[in-house]
Amino acid sequence: MASGGTGESGFTVEAAGRALEAACGDVGLDAAGARLVRLGSNAVYALADGRVIVRITADAEELAEVARTVAVARWLAEVHLPANRLVSGIAQPRVVQGHAVTFWESVQDDEEYATLPELADLLKQLHWLDEPEALALPYFDPAPKVRAGLAGLGAGVRPEDAAFLCERADRLEKEYGRLDFVLPFGLIHGDANIGNVLRNRAGRAVLIDLDDFALAPREWDLIQTALFYDRFGWHTRAEYASFVDHYGFDVMNWPGYEVLADLRELMMTLWLGGKAAAEPKAAEEFARRVESIRTGGDRHLWQPF
C-alpha cells in the first residue's frame, strides 16, 4: 500500500490504510498488496486479487449516505439494471475505526469506458423505473452542493474569484427555481456522464458511482453529456447525436438548457477550487475555468480533471 499523502478533509493515506487492513480482516479478505486508486473525500483501494474494490469514507458522519448507496446498489441488482454490485455475503456498510467501509465487485481489469449510446440506453432504462419508497431517496436540489462548494474554496482562491462565483451562484439558484421542466420527475443517477459507465469483463456497459441517486427532473441526468459536447468539445457531434437518438430527447432544445449547463459547470469549477490550495494543477485549471466563465471565453480549453 502507498504511504504519505492527504485527501480532502485531512484524510491521510496512513489512516485509510489502517482502516483497510482492519476492515478486510473483519470479513476475511486479504489487504496485502492493495493498490490505492484514489484518495479524496473517500479512499478507494483495489485488492491484489483484482476482484474487490474497497471504499472508505473520511469519517463515519457519512454513514447514512453510504447506507443509502448500499440500498440503491442492492435494489438495482434486484431489478437487474446493469450497475456496480456489492460483494455478496458481507454485511454492509461497516464502521471500522471511525470510517464507513463498503466492498464492491471490481468491474474490469483494465479501464474501459462504454459508449454514449450505451449510457443513453442505461439512463432510459433507469428513468423508466419507479423508485421504491423504502430507498427514501432525497429530492435533488443543487443549492446545498453549490453552497458547500463555495464554503470549500480555500487559500488558493483569490477573494475576487470567490466573490464572482458566489454572485453567479445566487443568480443561478433563482433561475433554477423558475425553470419549467418537461421530462417526468423521478429517479436519477445524479452524476451521469461517460466517466461513470464502464464496460465489464463480459463486455456489458454498467453504471458506477451510485452516491448521487435522487428524485429530480430527468433533464439533470442529460446535462453533462450535452455540456461535454456543446461547450467543452469532449464529445463529437456524431457521438452526441447517437446519445440523443438512443435516449429520445435532446436537452439542448429545451429552453432551460443554458441554466442547467451553467449550474453544472459552476459545480465542476467549485470542486476544483476546493483542491486549489493543495494541488498546483487544480489551481491552474480552476483559474482557467473562472476566467472563461467571467469573460464568456472558450470552454474548449478546459481539461478533464
Could you tell me what each predicted segment is?
Residues S3-E8, G152-G156, E160, A238, ...:
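ATP/Mg2+ or Mg2+-diphosphate-binding catalytic cores
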Residues D26-A48:
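ATP-binding glycine-rich phosphate-binding loop
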Residues V13, G17, I53-Q97, D110-W128:
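A conserved alpha-helical element in kinase catalytic cores
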Residues D110-A163, L183-F185, L215:
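A cross-family kinase active-site recognition segment
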Residues S41-A48, I53-V54, L86, K174-L222:
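Active-site acidic catalytic loop and adjacent metal/ATP-binding pocket
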Residues A58-D59, Q97-Y113, W128, V146-G156, ...:
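A glycine-centered beta->alpha junction motif in the catalytic cores
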Residues R218-V251, L263-P280:
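Active-site activation/catalytic loop segments of kinase-like enzymes and analogous catalytic loops
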Residues M1-A31:
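Juxta-kinase regulatory segment immediately upstream of eukaryotic protein kinase catalytic domains
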